């Protein structure tokens, strides 16, 4: 496939100071530099920024950025979008400068989520040393994974699988009532897609959210780093969304917490890596092997 990894997220924010505290003091990222003096550029590795937070009137996901290997692979994305009748725009000079890439295109999925595909990122070779000593699991696996909200799970399945070429790794059946369908109606599906060895880089939930994003997963190297982040979050009174647990599909050991933007970050380790030649996509019938009590997120 042409798309290789989730490379960056651009997030509009109403409280930049809260995001600065959260990104640097809770997540343990390192501040980078960029062309927008008002934006916060958060580094995890040699990418110029994996998260870009910029001020605005809303708290929402603005763009998810997806990396291709070269100009030929980006052209494949263009060709596939054109064949499917999906409009796209070429990146402006300002966008290319801000993302520090050679080329990019912008387009929307069937639910209106904005995506960018690009190639030729200019890496930043100043070492990233987290103030808390941990390293993020990125490289060919990219930033992590993102769960987007969708208004049509069937259309999203066709778009990401058939147009963009993502590989379906797992599915989870949800009660139809969860998305406003009758009890005897079609089930809703939570789909998990991969584009590299990470079990999934993308999933979508058929439920609208104010921010357009359900959660973003960030992975570190070991369970101590997860526990230390949990301690930092609790000390800073960050609202928890789910307790520590281990998922059944990607085996991630993680907890969930709220961001200043209202969506969740899953902070975890030990995520499963797969090989497409031998992987068999199946249906998961549980969320976690243990833990992940999401009721804590519903408490006042």
Curated annotation (Swiss-Prot):
Binds 1 Fe(2+) ion per subunit. Its cofactor is Fe(2+). Disruption phenotype: Cells lacking this gene grow on cholesterol at a rate that is 60% that of the wild-type and develop a pink color consistent with the accumulation and nonenzymatic oxidation of a catechol. Disulfide bonds: none annotated. GO terms for molecular function: 3,4-dihydroxy-9,10-secoandrosta-1,3,5(10)-triene-9,17-dione 4,5-dioxygenase activity; ferrous iron binding; oxidoreductase activity, acting on single donors with incorporation of molecular oxygen, incorporation of two atoms of oxygen. Pfam families: BphC_D1, Glyoxalase. Residues 5-120, 142-270 form the VOC domain. Fe cation binds at residues 145, 215, 266. It catalyses: 3,4-dihydroxy-9,10-secoandrosta-1,3,5(10)-triene-9,17-dione + O2 = (1E,2Z)-3-hydroxy-5,9,17-trioxo-4,5:9,10-disecoandrosta-1(10),2-dien-4-oate + H(+). Substrate binds at residues 200, 215, 250, 256. GO terms for biological process: cholesterol metabolic process; lipid catabolic process; response to cholesterol. Keywords: Aromatic hydrocarbons catabolism, Cholesterol metabolism, Dioxygenase, Iron, Lipid degradation, Lipid metabolism, Metal-binding, Oxidoreductase, Repeat, Steroid metabolism, Sterol metabolism. It comes from the Bacteria. Signal peptide: none annotated. Pathway: Steroid metabolism; cholesterol metabolism. Its EC number is 1.13.11.25. It is an enzyme of class 1 (oxidoreductase). NCBIfam families: exdiol_diox_HsaC (NF045631). Homodimer. Catalyzes the meta-cleavage of 3,4-dihydroxy-9,10-seconandrost-1,3,5(10)-triene-9,17-dione (3,4-DHSA) to produce 4,5-9,10-diseco-3-hydroxy-5,9,17-trioxoandrosta-1(10),2-diene-4-oic acid (4,9-DSHA). Also involved in biphenyl and polychlorinated biphenyls (PCBs) degradation. Belongs to the extradiol ring-cleavage dioxygenase family. PANTHER family: GLYOXALASE DOMAIN-CONTAINING PROTEIN 5, GLYOXALASE FAMILY PROTEIN. This is Iron-dependent extradiol dioxygenase. It comes from Rhodococcus jostii (strain RHA1). The gene is hsaC.
